[in-house]
Amino acid sequence: MAISLTLESTAYTLDQLTAHPEAQIALAGRSNVGKSSLVNALAGRKKLAKVSSTPGKTRSVNFYLVEPLRFYLVDLPGYGYARASHSEREKWAKLLERYLTECASLKALALLLDCRLPPQQLDLNLASFAQAHGLPLVPILTKADKCNQRERAAKQKEWQNIVGVSPVLTSSSSRLGIDRLWQELARAAGVTIIPSAENAQ
């Protein structure tokens, strides 16, 4: 059983948010934290999600169907991009808040965090928001290949102390942690991956 990702639908406005009966795991993080690269690593494909060096490139809510497990990974717009207009930032903040609070199928928030950086206020705010609304967190440290082993361990401990959950260390380029992340995402969605099916293809 190979795991595959398919971009099934895209939403740009509140009205376009569709209700899917299947479980959903939201992917959120600061602009340029590496969400698109992580989606591609999970899919085992290089071009499923568009990757850009320009912060804030993802400006939509993208619903990726995970087969054959039948749940969605929902890629939310990156936040914290200072060059975006105030009205644009406000628009996406409202979209994010409505999705996180009104989607009955949402099972967890996968919060992407740059392994190289200290905890950022916007990340802390989103983690607190999720916890205040009873939304389970799956913290993910991205770009772990840029840090040495001591730095990785320190960052994991730091975030575990903050959110109460040890983050999954990942690297999209080396595929570090991708198999474990699939297990964590599936568990959060309420499904099980048998050992022979861990690798995304």
Curated annotation (Swiss-Prot):
Coiled-coil intervals, chain numbering: none
GO biological process: one example: division septum assembly
Chain positions recorded as Mg(2+) binding sites: 36, 58
The keyword Heme appears for this protein: no
Pfam families (alphabetical): MMR_HSR1 (PF01926)
Highest rank taxon of the organism: Bacteria
GO MF annotations, alphabetized: GTP binding; metal ion binding
PANTHER family in UniProt: ENGB-TYPE G DOMAIN-CONTAINING PROTEIN, MSS1/TRME-RELATED GTP-BINDING PROTEIN
Function: Necessary for normal cell division and for the maintenance of normal septation.
Protein name, entry field: Probable GTP-binding protein EngB
Organism in which the protein naturally occurs: Desulfovibrio desulfuricans (strain ATCC 27774 / DSM 6949 / MB)
GN (gene name): engB
